[in-house]
UniProtKB/Swiss-Prot annotation:
One of its GO terms (cellular component) is mediator complex. The gene is MED8. It comes from Aedes aegypti (Yellowfever mosquito). This is Mediator of RNA polymerase II transcription subunit 8. Component of the Mediator complex, a coactivator involved in the regulated transcription of nearly all RNA polymerase II-dependent genes. Mediator functions as a bridge to convey information from gene-specific regulatory proteins to the basal RNA polymerase II transcription machinery. Mediator is recruited to promoters by direct interactions with regulatory proteins and serves as a scaffold for the assembly of a functional preinitiation complex with RNA polymerase II and the general transcription factors. It holds the Pfam family Med8. One of its GO terms (molecular function) is transcription coregulator activity. Belongs to the Mediator complex subunit 8 family.
Amino acid sequence: MQREEKQMDMLLEAVLNRLNDLKHSIGAMIHRLETEYETINWPTFLDNFALISGHLTGLSKILSSEIGTPLRNLTVLPLLLTPERDEALLQLTEGRIPIFSHDLVPDYLRTKPDPGAESRMAAHEAKANNLQPDTAAKQVAQYNKVISHVWDIVSKAREEWDTEASSRPGIQQTSSLADTQALVAAVGVGNGLTMPVGPGGVPNAGIMIPPAIRQASPMSAVSPGAGPLGKMPSGIKTNIKSANQVHPYR
C-alpha cells in the first residue's frame, strides 16, 4: 500500500511539473503575440508552437504509462464544501477558484460531458449509425469528386502563376534615378535654379526660378510697365491711353 502511494505521488508530481511547463510555454507565447506581434517572425512562432506540442506529447506519455495505479481508476471526492470565499483554495489554484460550493463542484469535478451535450452527441451518433451503406458511399464519392475538382482548379492556377512569374523579365521601373537626383539637388541645395534680378539690377533673394522660365521671358522683351521678372508673358494686348484725354461721357 505504501509503495502504491509513493508511485502515485511520483506520478502526480511528474504530471504537475509537465502541466506547469505547459502553462508557462502557453503564457510566454501569448505574451509574445501581444507584445511582439509587429516583429515576430514565422520561425520563432513555429519554435514556440513546437515547444508547446512537446510538452503535450510528454504529458500524454506520462498519463499513458503504467506507473502505479492508472489515474482513470481513481475517483476525486470533495472533502469540504462551503459557500464562503476560501483564501487557501484561491492561492492554491492561482486565483482561478475562489469558492468550492455545492453548485460549482459538478462543473469542476465533472469527468463526463454535460448532460445536454451528451444527449445531443448520442443523437448524432444514432443518426450516423442509421445511415445506409449505399447512401454513405454515394456521399463519400460525391465529396471526393468535389475535392478533386477544387484540387484541379488550384493546381491549374498555380501552374499559370508559376509560368507567368518565370516568363516575366522583372519588375518594370516606374521612376528615373537621374530625375530623382536632380529633384533632390534642386530642393536641397538649389542646384539648377537661378536668382532673378529685380529693378535696378538688385538680385531678388525671395524668388528663384528655373532657367527654362527665365529664358522664356528675357529682360530685353520686358516692357517698363510690366510686372516683376519671373511671370509668364500675357497673351492679352492692352491699349493704355494718356490721362490728359477727356472722357467722352463726362
